[in-house]
Amino acid sequence: MIEATTDELLDYLADVIERAERFGATVLPPNDAETVAWERDGDQLCMDLAVHPPVGPSSRLVEIVLRERWRAAGSDRWELAEHGYELRDHELAYRRALHRHDVNDFVRTYGVATHEHCEATMGNPACGHSLANPPCRGALDGFDRLYGVWLSGTKPDCSQLRCLG
């Protein structure tokens, strides 16, 4: 389980933004908010970022979405409960995602807590859930993996992933 203090989470968010901007991407806050910040949802902290890699003016939208939910784990302690990191390339019409959610259900059904989605044609998955190997270690890792997929300039080969069902 990944744990952090509030100060570590503030630094972490700054690191994620800095990483994306270093690659020339634009980082946008969710839901037309004025700033990018952690949002509180009950006893959870939530990160929701839209990252737009640099594309030409006539290109269609490319977006990397980075979402995390951290739950309270003690005095000034948080643990990563869920994540969803997604690349949607509307120019090449594919989607790639790294997820961790509904952990108990996934462990019970598939024996793993994390999984991937791969759609070589967006909206047409060859498999509902694929094994995330290795599991994603957070938003920086998720961003690096998905940005690398986008930089390749080709659709991902989803047949190389092990289908969970």
PLM region spans:
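Short, solvent-exposed beta-strand/turn "edge" segments of beta-rich domains on protein surfaces
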Residues: R71-R77
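UBC/E2-like fold recognition across ubiquitin and ubiquitin-like conjugation systems
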Residues: M1-V65, N133, R137, F143-G165
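An exposed acidic His-Trp-rich patch
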Residues: R77-D141
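Short amphipathic alpha-helical "recognition" segments used for binding
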Residues: A72, A120-G123, S159, L164
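Short, flexible loop/turn elements at secondary-structure junctions
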Residues: V51-V55, E68-W70, L87-D89, D105
